[in-house]
Amino acid sequence: MAKKSKIAKAQKREALVAKYADKRAALKAAGDFIGLAALPKDSSPVRMHNRDLIDGRPHAYMREFGMSRLNFRQLAHKGQIPGVRKASW
């Protein structure tokens, strides 16, 4: 489980990215780089990092499922992820 402060910080960044997305796109299209520099740093989507939706773990993130490999493995063994089966060959 990630620290609550790290999870909260990531959520705050996501909110800032969503808030400034239209303004950032307009400034970028106009070529106003001074205006872009005046926006908050955390409003840039590059600064976002994928985190596990269940416990906030930042490493070993599986983009297709939105969770880390550890939670993916647990839920897959329980059969709670649709379309995922244990491999056998």
UniProtKB/Swiss-Prot annotation:
Question: One GO term of the cellular component aspect?
Answer: small ribosomal subunit
Q: Which GO terms describe its biological process?
A: translation
UniProt keyword annotations, A-Z:
Ribonucleoprotein, Ribosomal protein, RNA-binding, rRNA-binding
One GO molecular-function entry: rRNA binding
Q: What quaternary structure, including any partners, is listed in this protein's UniProt entry?
A: Part of the 30S ribosomal subunit. Contacts proteins S3 and S10.
Purpose of the protein: Binds 16S rRNA, required for the assembly of 30S particles and may also be responsible for determining the conformation of the 16S rRNA at the A site.
Name of the molecule in the record: Small ribosomal subunit protein uS14
The source organism is Leuconostoc citreum (strain KM20)
